[in-house]
């Protein structure tokens, strides 16, 4: 009898432990698979593609790749002597037409004062027309001078904001064309996280919700806030043919891949360029408040760590 009781007790204890383990594993699995999280997240930043507004030979490059620069710091300089001469020529034209306009103004004024008693109306009108033509040429010369001055100013390429120079691919002696990208500037203090959440998890994602960001290869957990959720993504299953008719791709009803929607997350603290734009991270949306990690069970902590590996 005692042996039977002992066997039943062992069986009951084993059964209870198995049930508890199953419940714990099930809860961890649900937390792991259904909570709003994704490993498909990337650090992003505001990037300015810097291109000159003038063409010419690059005479000086004042920075090196990956350098932190300040706003208005000189990055490189384009052939200034050519644009200085263009400005001098434009200023000479302005000076010439100013003198000519003064002469024609005096001539027209003299004829207007004498009137038709001394000369014909045609001669008076001709003097006034010549004055208007010269004034028009003067205005055109002044506009050309202003453009030449602007071009000269833009031979010096400056940083539009504080940030890091990256992908610098220009060197002194090269010819650069107008509008061609010379360097990219990653703006300082503009980093954020772009998380691509599955549509099945968007119910738990709202602007203002808190988020945890774990950079790939790091045990450090950053904090952030959901800034916005994209209003739409491209429908790859539907296109238009040459006549504008809709073309719908065939689909298997029992296989449905969840679409991923971009979610922008604002970081609580900027980390400089410790995690460059484009690097990956794991994002967990914790809801309206931050998660208290100290209260997590072993299985919850295990599930949280498993997110790093898939």
From Swiss-Prot:
One of its GO terms (cellular component) is plasma membrane. The chain crosses the membrane at residues 12-32. Pfam families: CusB_dom_1, HlyD_D23. Coiled coil: none annotated. It is a single-pass membrane protein. It is found in: Cell inner membrane. Forms an efflux pump with AaeB. Belongs to the membrane fusion protein (MFP) (TC 8.A.1) family. This is p-hydroxybenzoic acid efflux pump subunit AaeA. It comes from Salmonella arizonae (strain ATCC BAA-731 / CDC346-86 / RSK2980).
């Amino acid at each position: 009898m005692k042996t039977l009781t002992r066997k039943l007790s062992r069986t009951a204890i084993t059964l209870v432990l198995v049930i508890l383990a199953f419940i714990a594993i099930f809860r961890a699995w649900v937390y792991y698979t259904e909570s709003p999280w994704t490993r498909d997240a990337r650090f992003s930043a505001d990037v300015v593609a810097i291109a000159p507004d003038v063409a010419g030979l690059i005479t000086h490059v004042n920075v090196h790749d990956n350098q932190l620069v300040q706003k208005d710091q000189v990055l490189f300089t384009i052939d200034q002597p050519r644009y200085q001469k263009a400005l001098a020529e434009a200023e000479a034209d302005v000076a010439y037409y100013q003198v000519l306009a003064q002469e024609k103004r005096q001539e027209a004024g003299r004829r207007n004062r004498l009137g038709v008693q001394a000369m014909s109306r045609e001669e008076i009108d001709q003097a006034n027309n010549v004055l208007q033509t010269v004034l028009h040429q003067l205005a055109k010369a002044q506009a050309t001078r202003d453009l030449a001055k602007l071009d000269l100013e833009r031979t010096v390429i400056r940083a539009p904001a504080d940030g890091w120079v990256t992908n610098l691919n220009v060197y002194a002696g090269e010819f650069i064309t107008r509008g061609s990208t010379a360097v990219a500037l990653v703006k300082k203090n503009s980093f954020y996280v772009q998380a691509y959440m599955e549509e099945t998890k968007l119910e738990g994602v709202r602007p203002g919700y808190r988020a945890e960001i774990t950079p790939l290869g790091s045990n450090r957990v950053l904090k952030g806030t959901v800034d916005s959720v994209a209003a739409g993504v491209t429908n790859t299953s539907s296109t238009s043919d040459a006549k504008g008719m809709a073309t719908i791709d065939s689909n298997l009803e029992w296989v449905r891949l969840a679409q991923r929607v971009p979610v922008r997350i604002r970081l609580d603290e900027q980390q400089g360029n410790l995690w460059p734009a484009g690097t990956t991270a794991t994002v967990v949306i914790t809801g309206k408040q931050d998660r208290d990690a100290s209260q997590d069970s072993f299985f919850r902590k295990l599930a949280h760590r498993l997110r790093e590996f898939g």
